[in-house]
């Protein structure tokens, strides 16, 4: 589609459509055992992908036709993502950030239902604040009720998966945590947009958790490349 209007976030801020915000990148580290598994599965993926000219599309198509090497390669893709997305360090870091913002409305974004549920359960056990989950396994009515209740309570926490990236408007949400994310810039912008809606006097924070020395960092750099904002590495 053609670009009709192009505007920077600073211009949108001056118009009062978004609030002042900060993006903070939070590095995590694998323990030696985790890193060994990560390197092993990455090497398997590299080897199998090399058999298909390092073309992921060709690899995917070959796996669909039953090619054994391609299937192993696709399993390596899935295995690496699981190691990255569901690592317990994400749970610990997300809970610490949630505790730092005890009085604010928070949205936690995850790539998997397992991580989403784990964070929600941990927060429920450790704090006396409302916690909700939102993902594809909920019915349409359940999703509507979750959004309604989350929006009505000031210090509530919403743990969600990809299903929430588009179409939700809760202006009072001021903290976002990307507990796990992809390389997709559009997804990042949608997630950022959930917490920077313009409200007078509001300052928003978006935290991005990522594992150093892994593909996770590459995905973060890809989705935030050339972003017109201040990003803090902490």
Model-found features: residue ranges?
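A short beta-strand element within the Helicase C-terminal
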Residues: 157-160, 166-182, 187-188, 203-209
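Short glycine-/polar-rich loops that comprise or flank the Walker A/P-loop
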Residues: 1-3, 18-23, 127-130, 171-175, ...
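Alpha-helical scaffold elements adjacent to nucleotide-binding pockets in ATP/GTP-utilizing enzyme cores
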Residues: 37, 187-191, 223
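Cofactor-binding loop segments of dinucleotide-utilizing enzymes, especially the Rossmann-like FAD-
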Residues: 111, 136, 181, 209-211
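Conserved segment of the helicase C-terminal RecA-like domain
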Residues: 194-223
């Amino acid at each position: 589609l053609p670009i009709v209007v192009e505007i920077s976030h600073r211009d949108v801020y001056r118009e009062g459509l978004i609030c002042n915000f900060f993006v903070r990148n939070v590095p995590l580290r694998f323990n030696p055992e985790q890193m060994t598994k990560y390197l092993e599965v990455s090497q398997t993926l590299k080897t199998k992908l090399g058999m298909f000219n390092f073309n992921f599309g060709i690899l995917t198509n070959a796996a669909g036709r039953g090619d054994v090497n391609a299937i192993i390669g696709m399993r390596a893709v899935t295995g690496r993502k699981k190691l990255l997305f569901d690592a317990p360090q994400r749970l610990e870091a997300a809970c610490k950030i949630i505790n730092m913002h005890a009085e604010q409305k928070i949205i936690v974004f995850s790539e998997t239902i397992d991580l989403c549920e784990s964070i929600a359960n941990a927060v429920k056990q450790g704090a006396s604040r409302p916690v909700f989950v939102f993902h594809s396994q909920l019915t349409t009515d359940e999703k509507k009720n979750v959004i309604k209740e989350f929006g009505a309570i000031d210090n509530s926490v919403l743990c969600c998966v990809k299903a929430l990236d588009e179409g939700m408007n809760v202006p009072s949400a001021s903290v976002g945590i990307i507990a796990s994310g992809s390389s997709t810039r559009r997804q990042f912008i949608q997630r950022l947009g959930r917490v920077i809606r313009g409200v007078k006097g509001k300052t928003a924070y978006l935290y991005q958790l990522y594992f150093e020395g892994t593909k996770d960092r590459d995905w973060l750099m890809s989705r935030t490349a050339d972003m017109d904002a201040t990003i803090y590495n902490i």
